[in-house]
């Protein structure tokens, strides 16, 4: 958003925020032009990339900056309420902005990759876990999608995810919240490398049943206030029990993006290792069943 001219507000004790640039004045979109890859905070990311490369002498991999995704960036530039309204009342202007954002994301990713490769370091094109090999896609935050119908996501989400995928070798999509209503739309995304989600937010049983074995599923505890796990071991047990296959399953064994309280027990890593080693007793039977004619 800052590359397009939106003001970033740096709170003292919280994450930064963006003041909407467009609001209800949709005509402002017509005056926007695609920025350079050094505009706004993008330039700062590239500067930090250079510094990190110099100080590590190119020996440590460098991740893609967290540049979010087309829908998320457009919503920040508009302001979320104005953006959701504009999907219905001003679709041409929304598509114009999404087109510029997508092009800028592709160009910025290439620029950061070039800096990293020129230093002889490994470029990791994902800003969240797990590791994604260079050339196999790009991580995309698609949080705004949870507020869209499948039809709106088909129109305003999928074309730009596909453009990113075609240009960069795939997309690895993160979304907070419950996006299970978008299953049919997400299946239209080309080169879907993975889905990153909170188990308490997007019901993990449904996600695993629909996409298990088809793409990487990176599952974390989640931030739902009313749906809780009784500890990390309980979380791991329940995810393993629901997973139809271990293929592509990645379980976040941390609470960085998990809502827990004082009742959360201390995590016993040895217990987790044993659970992961044991897996799901149904997996061999399921694997055999999938091979049956």
Predicted segment positions?
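Active-site loop segments of alpha/beta catalytic cores
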Residues: 2-18, 34-293
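Residues forming anionic-ligand binding surfaces in small-molecule and nucleic-acid pockets
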Residues: 21-31
């Amino acid at each position: 958003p800052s590359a397009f001219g939106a003001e970033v507000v740096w709170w003292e004790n919280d994450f930064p925020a963006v003041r909407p640039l467009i609001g209800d004045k949709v005509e402002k979109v017509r005056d926007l032009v695609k920025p350079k890859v050094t505009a706004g905070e993008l330039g700062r990311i590239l500067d930090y990339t250079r510094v990190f490369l110099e100080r590590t002498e190119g020996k440590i991999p460098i991740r893609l900056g967290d540049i979010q995704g087309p829908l998320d960036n457009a919503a920040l530039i508009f302001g979320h309420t104005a953006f959701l309204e504009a999907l219905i009342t001003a679709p041409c202007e929304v598509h114009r902005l999404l087109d510029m954002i997508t092009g800028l994301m592709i160009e910025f990713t290439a620029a950061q990759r070039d800096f990293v490769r020129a230093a002889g370091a490994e470029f990791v094109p994902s800003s969240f876990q797990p590791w994604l090999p260079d050339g196999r896609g790009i991580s995309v935050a698609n949080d705004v999608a949870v507020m869209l119908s499948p039809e709106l996501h088909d129109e305003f989400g999928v074309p730009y995810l596909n453009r990113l995928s075609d240009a960069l070798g795939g997309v690895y999509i993160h979304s907070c919240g419950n996006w299970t209503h978008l299953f049919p739309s997400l299946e239209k995304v080309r080169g879907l490398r993975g889905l990153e989600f909170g188990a308490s937010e997007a019901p993990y049983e449904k996600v695993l049943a629909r996409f298990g074995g088809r793409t990487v599923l990176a599952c974390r505890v989640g931030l739902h206030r009313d749906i809780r796990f009784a500890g990390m071991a309980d979380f791991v047990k329940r995810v393993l029990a629901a997973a139809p296959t271990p293929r592509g399953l990645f379980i976040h064994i941390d609470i960085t993006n998990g809502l827990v309280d004082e009742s959360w027990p201390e995590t016993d890593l040895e217990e987790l290792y044993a659970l992961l080693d044991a897996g799901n007793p149904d997996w061999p039977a399921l694997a055999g069943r999938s091979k049956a004619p």
